[in-house]
Amino acid sequence: HNITYKIGYYLHLNNPKEWAFIILFSIIASLFFVFLDKLVLVGFQKRKIWSDTKYPIFNYFIWVITSVIFILGGTSVGYFISPDADGSGIPEMKTVLSGVPIYRYFSFNAFVGKSLGLFAVLVSGASVGKVGPYVHLSCLICTRLMKSNYFEKIDKSTSIKTTMLSVACATGITFALGCPLGGVLFSIESTASIYMVSNLWKSFFSSVICCFIFKMFYGETII
């Protein structure tokens, strides 16, 4: 019994609701990222079909024009939907995890704007990384889930809420990079000035679930 207690204390298993939240969040976030990836792939394939005509010069102009249209659409979401959708996401999350709140950074409009903006820019073929946006989107999903009635105690506790946001950062980076251990370590490096070691197990657990769902949908694709 003493050994079981020590293991439970070391792994911080004394709050089952936190682990239930991590499992549910990891599944929802991973499914959303898979959906977004599939949507980007479909959009890119549609662009290839549109530019596949008998005339090479038309193909070139159609490809360039559609690329410009998607880029303009992706960069306009900050103006038309939410200014909080602009930027990477990692510097802002580092600020939030340091204890400085950013007004409306986790709003629903920011989620819609970030999703549409990332989709449009990736479909355009622009050389834009997914790590920062996935961190922001992951934290947006985490925040929305914490607002539910069942997990309202997590949302009301500043320390637990910060822990869950750090877990969300690790999940977003893991899905973008495809590496659970590396994603967790990189999330510590990029988003935290002071890191609670007790959060390491939770972040790694969420990242493993993320990779498992990735494997389910992408099969033998290397991750």
Pin down the residues of each PLM region:
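Alpha-helical transmembrane segments and immediately membrane-proximal extracytoplasmic
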Residues: H1-I223
